[in-house]
Regions:
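Short glycine- and acidic-rich boundary segments immediately preceding or forming the N-terminal edge
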Residues: 1-28, 231, 235
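Active-site neighborhood of HAD-like aspartate-dependent phosphohydrolases
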Residues: 15-98
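Glycine-rich phosphate-binding loop signature in dinucleotide/nucleotide-binding domains
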Residues: 42-43, 130, 176-181
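Short, basic/glycine-rich phosphate-binding loops at helix/coil junctions
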Residues: 90-107, 147-153
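Short, acidic loop-to-helix structural element flanking the phosphoryl-transfer center
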Residues: 95-96, 108-134, 141-148
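Substrate-recognition "cap/lid" segment bordering the active-site pocket of phosphatases
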Residues: 140-183, 190-196
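Short acidic-hydrophobic, aromatic-tinged amphipathic segments that line or gate anion-handling sites
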Residues: 159-165, 223-233
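Acidic, Mg2+-coordinating phosphoryl-transfer loop and its flanking beta/alpha structural elements
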Residues: 184-228
Length: 246
């Protein structure tokens, strides 16, 4: 449910459109390449690549607040948005065709004001003494500045990349820039899988901040570590860094 969407990563998936049967884990959207290439990264220094929604920011709580203003509610019976957002007056689900506009409205209204996940800023601040940090989020490109401002206001001032689609290709390109240990945190299993296929050495952390979502999904099969708490994610990263001499 990360990246302000259900377990997909694009507006089309939110709308109910099916992703391609076998998406390329190495694919990278053309809008992402210049964002990565513009980053100032130090070769030989470890890199932490973190998702935003349900990892750094409380997406679900923010979405529920927004839905309330629209006369809607989230019937959280599965790890998805399409089919689970219902009208309060009729209890009918919002049709898939209306989901893109609904989510666009949410982005415009709420991207800048989502609450931070407890412990995220403190953990990344400590880890930044030993590693570089980049936020890789499937937020619409036009909302990138708002996302950066929101994270910065919460004490998370690191560069933001507005991704589109799976994240394997982006992480692989980032890893090639640093040639050092890479850690990837995300709540979406198929994002973790795409990174596992695109850059096998990456340490994969399945992080879901909201306990309701965590109970619905369970650990991703390709993750090396699963948690809902930043203190535990920090310990895992610190131990791996120490084991690799950093």
């Amino acid at each position: 449910m990360s990246e302000a969407r259900d377990p997909g990563a694009t507006a089309g998936e939110v709308a109910g459109a099916r992703p391609k049967p076998a998406p390329d884990p190495l694919a990278i959207d053309e809008s992402v390449i210049p964002q990565i290439d513009a980053l100032t990264l130090t070769r030989g220094r470890p890199l932490i690549v973190s998702d935003a929604d349900e990892v750094l920011l409380q997406f679900l709580v923010g979405l529920e607040r927004y839905l309330e203003t629209q006369g809607l509610w989230l019937d959280l019976t599965s790890f998805a948005l399409t089919g689970n957002i219902r009208r309060r007056d009729t209890n009918e689900p919002v049709p898939p065709s209306e989901m893109p506009a609904l989510m666009d409205g949410f982005f415009v209204a709420s991207t800048h004001e989502l609450d931070v996940v407890p412990g995220a800023a403190e953990a990344l601040d400590a880890l930044s003494e030993r590693a570089q940090v980049v936020v890789l989020t499937n937020v619409p490109l036009e909302q990138k500045a708002k996302r950066e401002a929101c994270l910065g206001a919460h004490g998370i001032p690191w560069p933001v990349i507005a991704n589109k689609g799976l994240k394997g290709g982006a992480v692989r390109r980032l890893a090639a820039r640093v040639e050092a240990p890479v850690f990837f945190l995300d709540d979406i299993p198929h994002n973790l899988t795409s990174v596992a296929k695109a850059h096998m050495p990456t340490h994969l952390i399945h992080f879901i901040a909201d306990p309701r979502l965590s109970k619905l999904l369970g650990p991703a099969k390709d993750s090396h570590f699963h948690t809902t708490e930043w203190s535990k994610a920090r310990t895992f990263i610190e131990e791996k860094l120490a084991a690799e001499g950093f």
